Amino acid sequence: MDLNRIIQALKGTIDPKLRIAAENELNQSYKIINFAPSLLRIIVSDHVEFPVRQAAAIYLKNMVTQYWPDREPPPGEAIFPFNIHENDRQQIRDNIVEGIIRSPDLVRVQLTMCLRAIIKHDFPGHWPGVVDKIDYYLQSQSSASWLGSLLCLYQLVKTYEYKKAEEREPLIIAMQIFLPRIQQQIVQLLPDSSYYSVLLQKQILKIFYALVQYALPLQLVNNQTMTTWMEIFRTIIDRTVPPETLHIDEDDRPELVWWKCKKWALHIVARLFERYGSPGNVTKEYFEFSEFFLKTYAVGIQQVLLKILDQYRQKEYVAPRVLQQAFNYLNQGVVHSITWKQMKPHIQNISEDVIFSVMCYKDEDEELWQEDPYEYIRMKFDIFEDYASPTTAAQTLLYTAAKKRKEVLPKMMAFCYQILTDPNFDPRKKDGALHVIGSLAEILLKKSLFKDQMELFLQNHVFPLLLSNLGYLRARSCWVLHAFSSLKFHNELNLRNAVELAKKSLIEDKEMPVKVEAALALQSLISNQIQAKEYMKPHVRPIMQELLHIVRETENDDVTNVIQKMICEYSQEVASIAVDMTQHLAEIFGKVLQSDEYEEVEDKTVMAMGILHTIDTILTVVEDHKEITQQLENICLRIIDLVLQKHVIEFYEEILSLAYSLTCHSISPQMWQLLGILYEVFQQDCFEYFTDMMPLLHNYVTIDTDTLLSNAKHLEILFTMCRKVLCGDAGEDAECHAAKLLEVIILQCKGRGIDQCIPLFVQLVLERLTRGVKTSELRTMCLQVAIAALYYNPDLLLHTLERIQLPHNPGPITVQFINQWMNDTDCFLGHHDRKMCIIGLSILLELQNRPPAVDAVVGQIVPSILFLFLGLKQVCATRQLVNREDRSKAEKADMEENEEISSDEEETNVTAQAMQSNNGRGEDEEEEDDDWDEEVLEETALEGFSTPLDLDNSVDEYQFFTQALITVQSRDAAWYQLLMAPLSEDQRTALQEVYTLAEHRRTVAEAKKKIEQQGGFTFENKGVLSAFNFGTVPSNN
């Protein structure tokens, strides 16, 4: 390869004027052998300009991630897709570790991503030598090679970070070499607090964290080595950050390597305590370790963390993530007596001076509110910000302490009450007090000591602050209303005030963060309080208009959810404004989708998705208003068109759901045109979305069968889609859906003249059965299509089976089909599939012109049917049982709980006692019961796609089968004897039960029909109702 030519092309990609020509040059060269190793040589060369090296690194990363592994050709194609040649791969393996060690940071980032992809595909099979190579550089006398080799080791460990313990053996073998090595290295580095030394220490900590985050490899750490590691973590957490760092701007300090190193050490100890060191909260393989951890390390580490919190209390700087992880660790310690004893004397100071301080409104909050209120909203509602926030961690610690340790809540409430009742207190502290009380709302509403005081608290301390001249206090007050929205109000006026103030804040407040909090509070009050819902009925239109305005301005997903919930609460009122609302939402969606930053901002995708869900909710609400639905259809079709035109595949699922909602009752000509458009999209890039298309396709078949059959193109489209799925590599779930659609078409069109389709459908599914099928669900679904064809027209199916010639199967396939069906009768699950199988077998046994294949399995037919009936009986019984259990659980849901642990007791002791008192039934048994329910219920996604056989007045499988047997008995006694001969006594008893039930069902159906013909049920007044009178006073007679 000509290196200079590649260098010039890479240089051209940086220049906008030359970019297209340069990219074309590279695209013509990348498949040439030695191209990828040439890129690596350019990357590591000090003689090449840095921007070119960086461009080469990005290009190589893209090549490796896309073209490294060997790939098979698509089904039906002989040409193998391109991948990097093995000679080139070996050259890269031989040199990439050195490349990472020698490269500057910005290039090194790209190369480590290459290495991760290579390790993922090649280790250990194709590249066991990577371990020796990393180890060689780790042991080097030159410290310059340590960081690069540690980064390589990190990629190795990260590759296995989320794998199950049994899949990590190659990593465990490697870490038997590396773990002692990096422990020794970090011990040597600890006394040196220079930038480079601490950078190396941080990287070692990151390796350890990735190793233990999801599984602790006990075979790598014994008590002695773990003690050394814990001492390392304790030392790093406890050591002083160089004082010169205080000269750096506070916003930049968390990124300093000394604070990051502390953060990772804390991250590790918090994770070890939470996942492996808390007895009573670990899986059985960690029982022994958890006891050892709690007794040996927990208190010592906590001592250091209490010191950190004291530093924060003394106004010394502590990085936010360090503070957050300290709170997380202490949160685990609250429930264990050994750590609680140490924490208990300090908990009041921690609560009042540290947690409270963190939960107050701060200078940085005020700065963001004033400079960019929309960014303030985004930050406050960002779940990822929450995850890393010291405020959230402080809130969680306080909540746990208040819930588990009885002395905490009264003292904290007294502290907050003092602040709220003193008019001279700093308003920011009032915000903190409200924040604390709102965070504890769930506990306060269950404690008899406090719950009756909460209404007075809202009246005296929250309602007035909703009118404060400080925006942040108004927002916090709305947040508190939200937190206490389930409160049982004794004074109706207070409830009315709460709702009116929330509405006023939503509609009239000028500050957007207040409006957002008010929206959430108002919706929560309406959902939890029946009277609140009534109060707001006259104001639905202005409320909805304001919510739409907020969404348009802020693009906040939480407010989109509020709109959805409000639509459900006020379905009748929303109907009158549905068109305007949908138009507004469509405009917001279009604006979001076409904004310049849409591609880069994930929040916008979530919010746009929320808008589509909201429009779908509106469609559901107005489904009975045909004239409104017709107007909404045009708006929705514009949205669907926009998404399809821009190929925004992440919204395909949502627009298909919209189309489904628009076709649930009738299908307009425009929606039939959409079928053709979707077919074109399906051909291009919607192949994997077939399962999402299925509900819509089902509607096309079942809602407007006349139009479906009026144009042969419609059925052709549906068949072609099913064929593409069943002949491609969409996966067996999609294939099951395709087979189901074919079955639905056959059953829906029985007697409607689709005879010409039956051979095509049957051949397609039986051909699929000749290729490898992994799941019984796909096997039975393919069989079910043929069974549906048997129900449609028995002679047509048998004729089709005789004519079909399958590859590698000489002669007709009737015998194979019948045998496969008989072998798989126990695989038909759920109600519909069993019913279909019973009807099919009943037709089979009643055939007059029976193929020899049926005679050959005569002894299996009736036993198989009886087995299927037994399965149906279990499904019905289990459904009734589950319904009863659901009602029972609902009744228990409102019981008050007391989870406090008496002063210094261990939570695990309390848990053990509770389990013993629960009739000896532990969690494992309960989980097994849940599994059993799922297994017997056998509900699948396919059960939801109804057919005419699933209607209440459809063919009854019990009557169908017994009638078939009676017919055979009277017509062909010899065949009847052959069918009955193999039955055991138990099976004959079961058969009699089926006969009895069939007769009962026939009698019930006839009685029901007779009543319907007479105009419905009439109830005679027998005096029963008059016996129940809840309004009268009993007499003394």
Swiss-Prot record:
Biased composition (Polar residues): 909-920
Superkingdom of origin organism: Eukaryota
Transmembrane segments: none
Residues with PTM Phosphoserine: S902, S903
Keyword Transport: yes
Cytoplasm listed as a keyword: yes
Variant or mutagenesis effect after changing Y317C: In VISS; uncertain significance
UniProt keyword annotations, A-Z: Aortic aneurysm, Cytoplasm, Disease variant, Nucleus, Phosphoprotein, Protein transport, Transport
Biased composition (Acidic residues): 896-908, 923-934
Quaternary structure note: Forms a heterodimer with KPNB1. Interacts with SRP19. Interacts with RPL23A. Binds directly to nuclear pore complexes. Interacts with LRPPRC; the interaction occurs when LRPPRC is in its RNA-free form and promotes import of LRPPRC to the nucleus to allow for EIF4E-mediated export of mRNAS from the nucleus to the cytoplasm.
PANTHER family in the cross-refs: IMPORTIN-7, 8, 11, IMPORTIN-8
Known function: Involved in nuclear protein import, either by acting as autonomous nuclear transport receptor or as an adapter-like protein in association with the importin-beta subunit KPNB1. Acting autonomously, may serve as receptor for nuclear localization signals (NLS) and promote translocation of import substrates through the nuclear pore complex (NPC) by an energy requiring, Ran-dependent mechanism. At the nucleoplasmic side of the NPC, Ran binds to importin, the importin/substrate complex dissociates and importin is re-exported from the nucleus to the cytoplasm where GTP hydrolysis releases Ran.
Protein name: Importin-8
